[in-house]
């Protein structure tokens, strides 16, 4: 024990602790300052923590929003179910109320016997207040109308449509004509469901029996597809031998009747097959389209003077192009996907280009009905949205051919072409009797009856219709060019094209103001429509080309034409009214003097009938004025004024005004 208390080491430690200063007086150890890298690392760590907390908060809010949306949808669906149940319950209660009213009426209605016994009493006695109240409480009679639901049989309607189909001007239906037409040496197999049609047997009965059998089996679209299929099989089988040509135009007309029955019933696949089939048929025998422009002096013309075979070729081509045009019309009502399926097919596009080249070529004789078909087809294609890919490189070739047919005047001097098509009649259809005469109704034949090559001259009605459709061709071509220039402005718009447009615009306006000024005809209205679309085309090209292009153009004809539109407005001012009357009245006076000569024998010069004076003062003057200003609307006048102001200066405009409106 003494040794433990005597330890010097422990004493030293105790003394050191006793002598240590208090904690408040001891110096705090100073930490070395942190470096910038450590501070940046610390800040990044804090940012990471904050981001993690923010993401967790966003996740929590997102889950809360999802839960709220689910709750809202569930509440909404439950609310809708409750509303539906309440509506059903309300309808049930309404039915019960009506039933109770009917029961009440039945209970309060007296029997016939009691009514007959008390009739005299009710007539003499006054009604009591209770009876009046009861009478007022009686409900109004309600009647339930019974409507019969008729189910329309589309198949039977389609079958009747084919049975009653006639060509324009014909006395017999097409199927009746096919009842007297057979094949030469060709056996037909229209369908596996039908037996073979032997040669020298009529074609009408098997076609009729097949469609009659299918109309109760298939739906309308399936029936249309099957009918088009058997007609295509018949045409392809019959066209192998030239002796079987008699049946072809009538089968093509039935194909047109089939697709034209109801456009919505023709499927896209059927349209594509019809396009392919008809274009192949046209290309296989285009001799009718390749008639020489001029007769050869070396032609001996020793063939028989008959017309039936040329007539069959003409009807086949005309009806084929009518079918193509109708297919385009149906395709215009389809969606973009269907349009792409048909028109973006390379084979169909190539065949259509070949058919158009045959028709629009200036090396061959122009056939006006078919040219109308081609322009309508191209106008429909250029308006379709799905015909951009395959047709992009083909419009350049067609554009040149369209210009050639655009600037030349189409004449129709062949009386042999005066037949009506399936879509329109470009003449007066004076040759319609030949369609019935080519068929023998007394026997079944594969050869046509002999038709002599003798025709009546074209009537005034036919010539007027031909003029109308020739102007319509130019309108269609103008619209096609306008659409194409919107897409391919840089490649198609040229100086030559613009000069031809100016010349065509000037020539038609000159015809309207000189040759046809005294005429009141529907073709004049169509010509004014042509001038309107030409002006729109000129305006579009004018605002699209550069000033360098404009300086290279010859603008004298265009300037005069535009001045007539801008300053030939009859309702602008009294001064202008006097001036346009001064321009028109001398021309009208010459025509009126010619008309007065017809009345020299019946009337004196001073005692002309009253209608002559009214005609002099009102009717013809108004007709001439409308032609002079081209029936231009305000937008067209603004277009013409814009072009005219960019062409001429103010001094040139004043000089032109003085030169054209001189005092007489």
Curated annotation (Swiss-Prot):
Specify where the region named Disordered lies, as residue ranges. 61-81, 109-132
| SS bond partners | none
Please give the GO cellular component terms listed in this UniProt entry: cytoplasm; nucleus
InterPro entries from the xrefs? DNA_damage_chkpnt_Lcd1
Specify where it is mainly localized.
Answer: cytoplasm
Keywords (alphabetical) are: Chromatin regulator, Coiled coil, Cytoplasm, DNA damage, DNA repair, Nucleus, Phosphoprotein
Q: Superkingdom, according to UniProt?
A: Eukaryota
Q: Which GO terms of type biological process are on file?
A: chromatin organization; DNA damage checkpoint signaling; DNA repair
- Cell location: Cytoplasm; Nucleus
Where in this chain does the entry annotate a coiled-coil region?
Answer: 38-107
Assembly and interaction partners: Forms a complex with MEC1.
Function recorded in the entry: Forms a complex with the serine/threonine kinase MEC1 which activates checkpoint signaling upon genotoxic stresses. The MEC1-LCD1 complex is recruited to DNA lesions in order to initiates the DNA repair by homologous recombination. Required for cell growth and meiotic recombination.
For this entry, the protein name equals DNA damage checkpoint protein LCD1
> What is the source species?
Kluyveromyces lactis (strain ATCC 8585 / CBS 2359 / DSM 70799 / NBRC 1267 / NRRL Y-1140 / WM37)
Gene name, please? Answer: LCD1
């Amino acid at each position: 024990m003494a040794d433990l208390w005597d330890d010097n080491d422990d004493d030293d430690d105790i003394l050191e602790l006793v002598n240590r200063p208090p904690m408040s007086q001891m110096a705090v150890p100073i930490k070395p300052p942190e470096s910038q890298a450590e501070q940046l690392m610390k800040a990044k760590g804090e940012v990471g923590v904050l981001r993690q907390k923010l993401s967790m908060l966003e996740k929590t809010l997102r889950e809360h929003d999802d839960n709220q949306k689910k709750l809202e949808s569930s509440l909404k669906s439950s609310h809708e179910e409750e509303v539906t149940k309440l509506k059903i319950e309300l309808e049930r209660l309404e039915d019960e109320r009506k039933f109770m009213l009917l029961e009440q009426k039945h209970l309060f209605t007296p029997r016939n016997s009691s009514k007959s016994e008390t009739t005299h009493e009710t007539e003499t006695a006054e009604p009591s207040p209770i009876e009046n109240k009861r009478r007022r409480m009686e409900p109004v009679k309600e009647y339930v109308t019974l409507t019969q639901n008729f189910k329309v049989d589309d198949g039977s309607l389609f079958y009747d449509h084919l049975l009653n189909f006639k060509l324009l001007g014909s006395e017999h239906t097409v199927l009746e004509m096919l009842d007297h037409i057979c094949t030469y040496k060709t056996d037909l197999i229209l369908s596996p469901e039908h037996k073979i049609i032997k040669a020298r047997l009529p074609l009408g009965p098997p076609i009729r029996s097949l469609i009659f059998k299918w109309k109760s089996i298939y739906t309308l679209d399936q029936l249309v597809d099957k009918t088009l299929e058997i007609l295509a099989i018949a045409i392809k089988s019959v066209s192998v031998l030239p002796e079987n040509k008699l049946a072809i135009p009538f089968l093509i007309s039935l194909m047109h009747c089939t697709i034209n029955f109801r456009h919505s019933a023709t499927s896209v696949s059927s349209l594509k097959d019809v396009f392919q089939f008809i274009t192949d048929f046209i290309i296989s025998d285009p001799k009718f389209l390749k008639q020489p422009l001029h007769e050869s002096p070396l032609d001996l013309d020793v063939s028989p003077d008959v017309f039936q075979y040329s007539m069959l070729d003409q009807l086949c081509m005309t009806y084929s192009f009518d079918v193509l045009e109708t297919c385009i019309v149906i395709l215009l009502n389809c969606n973009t996907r269907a349009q792409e399926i048909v028109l973006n097919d390379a084979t169909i596009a190539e065949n259509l280009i070949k058919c158009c080249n045959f028709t629009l070529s200036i090396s061959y004789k122009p056939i006006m009905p078919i040219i109308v078909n081609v322009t309508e087809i191209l106008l429909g294609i250029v308006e379709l949205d799905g015909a951009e890919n395959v047709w992009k490189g083909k419009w350049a070739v067609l554009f040149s051919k369209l210009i050639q047919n655009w600037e030349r005047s189409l004449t129709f001097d062949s009386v042999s072409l005066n037949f009506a098509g399936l879509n329109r009649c470009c003449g007066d259809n004076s040759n319609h009797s030949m369609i019935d005469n080519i068929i023998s109704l007394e026997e079944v034949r594969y050869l046509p009856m002999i038709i002599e090559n003798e025709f009546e001259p074209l009537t005034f009605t036919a010539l007027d219709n031909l003029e109308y459709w020739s102007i319509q061709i130019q309108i269609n071509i103008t619209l096609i060019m306008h659409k194409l220039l919107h897409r391919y402005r840089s490649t198609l718009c040229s100086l030559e094209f613009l000069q031809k447009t100016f010349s065509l615009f000037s020539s038609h306006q000159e015809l309207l103001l000189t040759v046809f000024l005294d005429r009141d005809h529907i073709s004049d209205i169509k010509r004014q429509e042509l001038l309107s679309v030409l002006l729109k085309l000129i305006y579009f090209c004018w605002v699209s080309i550069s000033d360098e292009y404009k300086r290279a153009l010859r603008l004298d004809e265009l300037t005069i034409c535009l001045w007539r539109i801008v300053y030939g407005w009859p309702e602008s001012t009294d001064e202008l009214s006097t001036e346009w009357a001064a321009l028109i009245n001398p021309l009208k006076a010459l025509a009126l003097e010619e008309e007065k000569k017809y009345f020299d024998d019946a009337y004196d010069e001073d005692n002309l009938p009253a209608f002559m004076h009214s005609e002099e003062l009102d009717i013809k003057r108004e007709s001439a004025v409308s032609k002079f200003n081209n029936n231009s609307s305000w937008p067209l006048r603004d277009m013409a004024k814009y072009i005219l102001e960019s062409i001429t200066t103010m001094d040139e405009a004043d000089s032109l005004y003085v030169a054209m409106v001189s005092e007489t």
